[in-house]
């Protein structure tokens, strides 16, 4: 919510909003691993850096490692320009650290996933969480769980059944919505066994989309859709939602 507020106030277009959103969430998600890579090349450890320097280095490193669409020189130059506005004296330091990361990226990214500590660093989890998972599931399965959790989730839309016109089938309504989305250049696909679900790629801002604003679709994971189908609630059913957002 806070991020959306700032993005809307900044007046950015959808492409820039997407860039900022990935950067913010990516840094939060990968913070420990980013700090690990920065510490490999920096004489000053991350925990001893000024807040502005630490943040800009995380931003630059994330772009170098995780954003293939951003050229290395662009990530470095923009990071240097940003730190000049915040702390001009640190510009040469930020430049040197990011260039060292760029030059030796493969070596800097490498980490052997053979210990709890290294799993915690690479997947950016607190050590106690990884220890608990290993105790419960074993080392190999824990790595598989952490790897799965690190994947970017797909976006699924649930079509609202209450929008059906008299005599209209759900298949027809979903099909029309899919055609509408494809006409806007979005990649969409239906989901076998869940007729109200649509997988969509390239959707930047759902909250402003007419289909969302008019109540035809909402964003929902497949697991949540399956729960509702298994429950099969009736018109007079009383349902207690314990996981409401």
Positions of predicted regions on the chain:
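Class I SAM-dependent methyltransferase Rossmann-like catalytic core
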Residues: 211-217
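Glycine-centered loop/turn positions within well-structured domains
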Residues: 155, 225, 237
């Amino acid at each position: 919510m806070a991020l959306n507020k700032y993005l809307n106030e900044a007046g950015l277009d959808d492409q820039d909003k997407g860039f900022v959103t990935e950067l913010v969430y990516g840094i939060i998600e990968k913070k420990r691993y980013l700090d690990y890579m920065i510490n490999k090349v920096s004489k000053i450890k991350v925990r001893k850096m000024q807040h502005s320097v630490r943040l800009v280095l995380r931003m630059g490193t994330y772009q170098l490692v995780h954003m293939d669409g951003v050229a290395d020189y662009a990530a470095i130059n923009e990071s240097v320009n940003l730190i000049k506005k915040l702390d001009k004296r640190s510009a040469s330091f930020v430049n040197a650290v990011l260039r060292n990361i760029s030059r030796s990226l493969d070596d800097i990214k490498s980490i052997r996933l053979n210990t709890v500590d290294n799993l915690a660093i690479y997947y950016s989890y607190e050590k106690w969480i990884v220890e608990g998972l290993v105790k419960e599931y074993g080392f190999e399965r824990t790595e598989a769980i952490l790897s799965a959790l690190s994947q970017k989730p797909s976006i699924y839309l649930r079509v609202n059944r209450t929008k059906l016109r008299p005599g209209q089938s759900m298949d027809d309504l979903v099909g029309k919505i899919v055609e509408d989305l494809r006409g806007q250049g979005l990649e969409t696909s239906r989901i076998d066994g869940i007729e109200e679900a649509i997988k969509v790629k390239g959707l930047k801002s759902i909250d402003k989309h007419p289909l969302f604003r008019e109540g035809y679709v909402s964003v929902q994971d497949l697991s949540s859709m399956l729960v509702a189908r298994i429950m099969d609630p009736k018109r007079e059913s009383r349902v207690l939602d314990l996981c409401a957002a």
